[in-house]
Amino acid sequence: MPAIEVGRVCIKTAGREAGKVCVIVDILDKNFVIVDGLVKRRRCNIKHLEPTEKKVDIPKGASTEEVKLALDAAGLLKEE
């Protein structure tokens, strides 16, 4: 199980959105990813993410609506 992959559900550990649930939407390079979900869609350092065991099925570069639907289907949307 790769820790950093598209669709991996993570918890942000730094910044104003610390403690919120997010999903990796795209991988930019070895240090940065694009996250979306219960946080604003933005670039994030992987050192500021704590990957969970959960993974949602989304395509690379999925829209915010697709991410929210996948989180809702997985029952993770209410974790705030």
Swiss-Prot record:
One of its GO terms (cellular component) is cytosolic large ribosomal subunit. CDD domains: KOW_RPL14. Keywords: Ribonucleoprotein, Ribosomal protein. Pfam families: KOW. One of its GO terms (molecular function) is RNA binding. The keyword Membrane does not apply. InterPro entries: KOW (IPR005824), Rib_uL2_dom2 (IPR014722), Ribosomal_eL14 (IPR039660), Ribosomal_eL14_arc (IPR023651), Ribosomal_eL14_KOW (IPR041985), Translation_prot_SH3-like_sf (IPR008991). Signal peptide: none annotated. GO terms for biological process: ribosomal large subunit biogenesis; translation. The keyword Ribonucleoprotein applies. NCBIfam families: PRK04333.1. HAMAP family: Ribosomal_eL14. Belongs to the eukaryotic ribosomal protein eL14 family. This is Large ribosomal subunit protein eL14. The lineage of its organism: Archaea, Methanobacteriati, Methanobacteriota, Methanomada group, Methanococci.
